[in-house]
Amino acid sequence: MSTRQYVVSTIALALAVSATMAACASGDIAAASTASDVPAAYRKYSSEVQLSIDGDFVVLTATGVPNHKSPYFASSDARYEAYNGTNRSFAKAPGSIDATRYVMRIPMRPARAATSAATPLGPIGLALNGVPFFNQYNGQNRPLTVEIDSFDQYNGHPTPTNAYHYHVEPLYLTRTIGGDQLLGFLLDGFPVYGPVEGGRRVTNADLDQLHGHLGKTSDYPDGIYHYHITDADPYLNGAGFYGSAGTVNR
């Protein structure tokens, strides 16, 4: 082989190796960003929620805007719907629905915490339609006794800064997918289920002080600790998180 042929061959080989490495790296990046890599139950999130993995965490990114109508949308918005629920004491809160960017990092392999930390005010998890869950207290850290009258026909309402959320059963979801189905996850990585299990309504007496229990579900046939929505205080979550909570930024 001549010197010229050797040089050409060497350059060609280097280019081929470089292209292969670039293709592999590109493929790795693409694979890491696909929803198919997250645990199966997370793939039940709607298209409004972006899914990715960051180390040992599932990352959920959402705007908090519901995929159903509400009197809290502007009256000129196609998503506006006057209140048509069953609460005769309904009184619209002074707020509306604006997009609020949430980035939640949730443990992919949740485990029971040594000590159950209290849930904070504000977002404590995310429903399947990208609307955040809040705990059983209002913005002044008081019971929801009065604020319940401001919940729309799907049981949501906005904060004074226009961040829509659920404190109680998200009726649009339970009516659409069923009362015994997965509704979302709390920040500690444990799932939230509707108010029905085994063909009967769940009551607070069926649950522990954190508002959950261990058991099999359709998404976790081997069993997992899970929270339940009920129709009585504390509605969604009790004395704190069962596991160690991840983080939320907005």
Can you say where each PLM-predicted feature lies in the sequence?
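Extracellular/lumenal glycan-associated surfaces
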Residues: 103-106, 127-132, 160-173, 220-234
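Short helix-loop boundary/capping segments
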Residues: 144-151, 160-201
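Long, compositionally biased interface segments
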Residues: 207-250
